[in-house]
Amino acid sequence: MRWLALVLGALLLAAPARAADAAGAQVLEHKGRWESGYGAQFYNVVGRLKNTSGHELRYVKLRIEALDEHGNVVARTDTYNESAEALAVPDLNPRELLESGKVKPLPADAEERFRGSFLKEETPAFTDYRVKVIETPAATPMKVIETPAGPSE
């Protein structure tokens, strides 16, 4: 029996362990394809991610990189989980959006979609792409603002 325990222990040590995602979120799946619309051609990447941090996240920021035949990055774009897509809009102030509460936090273990694209006319030729999680800040409790007491009657 002791021999069996030693063998099982050795097998467990030798088995590859799946480490928790250090970034706090995991890309579950993604697909990319050329599309056209609004008079432009673009390579659209859509996918799903999961909050693996064990706590609520303010947002998940991802980087999609276009790769040439040698694996070199020829273009990149940053994007966010679906609930936080407004953070990527150039005309909006991300800090104000986050402080206003307009960006819904991503609960622990929740899954959500993401998307990003490359315009054909602005992107060098590429043969593949990759998606990486680059930011996963923890959601912080909102401050409670006390209102002054009204006049006593």
Predicted regions: what is each one?
Residues A5-A14:
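Bacterial N-terminal signal peptides
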Residues A19-R48, T52, P148:
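Low-complexity, acidic Ser/Thr/Pro/Gly-rich terminal tails and inter-domain linkers that flank the onset
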Residues Y38-A40, L57, D109:
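Short coil/turn motifs at beta-sheet boundaries
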Residues H55-S100, P105:
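The feature marks short-to-medium sequence segments in extracytoplasmic or secretory-pathway proteins
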Residues E99-E153:
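Terminal connector regions
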